[in-house]
């Protein structure tokens, strides 16, 4: 089901009623506020194959009347809305206009928003990291960060050594970024053992295949060895680059020397 944002049919109507006598009004301004507004909703099922239009009327934040295209007429939600429901249901032109809103309002707006809201796809960025840097065999929290994706329907699963984890999972839920993208954190409580491989798998409409990101549990000594190896490799590249630079510079200097008096 796709749902378009509810749009107020008119600006909220605020009625200010002054009920105090002038002498009291001079002491303080205590005018009561009354809020009356309505909302139009479009509910889509399987694209525009089935569409439901709702027009809901509220008074002081309480719904009192609605029109439902599935019903085809106005229905009172509270006694306050009953007079309006009876009045509008007795006017065929009003009922005809509301029933036609399924096409004139909902399907019409669906075509406008289709490319931006319905078909729009933004692939998520997925990263995995532990919340604590500490030795193995201690309680830790692995975080799968999924960010900057659209639409909001997404599935995130955790695996340990290829087997899905069903317990110890905590999620922040869907968080709006404010730029038409979402983010979420899905965390796995675990006690990592040396050699274990943890995988975060993400499925999203923007992806043809699930995205998987691994985190391998390594002992401190193994991590130090790996860092030493990477550091040695980088240092070797630096020395190699410096040697090549000096060599080619010397070669260029020698080729530029010629005996005086020769024609070239």
Curated annotation (Swiss-Prot):
Residues 247-264 are cytoplasmic. Residues 27-121 are annotated as: Beta-1. Disulfide bonds join 38-106, 144-200. It comes from the Eukaryota. The lineage of its organism: Eukaryota, Metazoa, Chordata, Craniata, Vertebrata. Residues 1-26 form the signal peptide. InterPro entries: Ig-like_dom, Ig-like_dom_sf, Ig-like_fold, Ig/MHC_CS, Ig_C1-set, MHC/Immunoglobulin, MHC_I/II-like_Ag-recog, MHC_II_a/b_N. Residues 27-225 are extracellular. The keyword Isomerase does not apply. This is H-2 class II histocompatibility antigen, E-Q beta chain. It is a single-pass type I membrane protein. Keywords: Adaptive immunity, Disulfide bond, Glycoprotein, Immunity, Membrane, MHC II, Signal, Transmembrane, Transmembrane helix. It holds the Pfam family MHC_II_beta. It comes from Mus musculus. Residues 124-214 form the Ig-like C1-type domain. GO terms for molecular function: MHC class II protein complex binding; peptide antigen binding. Its main location: membrane.
